[in-house]
Amino acid sequence: MNARLTAALMLTALIAACSGGSDELRTQGGRYLTVVETLQNGLFQPEPELPNVTRALLDGLTVPSLEVAVPERDGLAYLVPLISRNDANLGPLDTWTTVDGTQLTLRSGVLVATRGLGDDVTSTDRRGSIAFVTGGGGANWPLRLDIQTSTDGVVRQDFNCTGQRNGRVTLEIVELTYPVESLSEICTDSSGARIENQYFVDTRDGTVWQTRQWAGEKIGYMNTRILKKK
């Protein structure tokens, strides 16, 4: 089975889980495949020349879409929802997937896990980050990332973080604009190494439309944008 057909079948299965009607499914699958079919060599490989993603294309879908870029790997991919749930006192947890099964998990827009990238984030302590993004939190908080490496097993990275509120701005994503608050999460480890995560949070309903988040030394920063919301 060639890569294009495999991608098409996996995409169709994902869309089938989110929408009904065979005619609608085939139409959406065809539209979305025009975007993802050039990503057949795997997620976040060097970026191919992608078709232009327009609002008209996105409006033709009933499934949400998440764009993820990894500048360190010169990679770009489009993901669709796999699992969503809302945990009491913890907030919504959303796992997104590509057609090849590589996954990214966000809680309230905050990165908590990756799968299939290599050197994946396997577990985290992001409670302080989530509180900050959702409007609460203290003056500082810990951030922990557990990274599954191919050579050293699980490597833990611990940071101490503070938050900075940068004010309200207008964010544009594929022909639509959103009123957002710009947030920075500034973290240092025991050696003095510094990372900075960025979040753009809708001032109306708290949707985290766009982020830039650290995912470990091998992956570097991951940039996410919600192209189409649930």
Predicted regions and their residues:
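Bacterial N-terminal signal peptides that target proteins for export
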Residues: 1-7
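C-terminal motif of bacterial Sec signal peptides marking the signal peptidase cleavage site
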Residues: 14-17
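Acidic, serine/threonine-rich low-complexity disordered tracts
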Residues: 19-116, 122-123, 138-230
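Intrinsically disordered, low-complexity regions
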Residues: 36, 127-130
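C-terminal partner/receptor-binding element of secreted or periplasmic proteins
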Residues: 128, 134-139
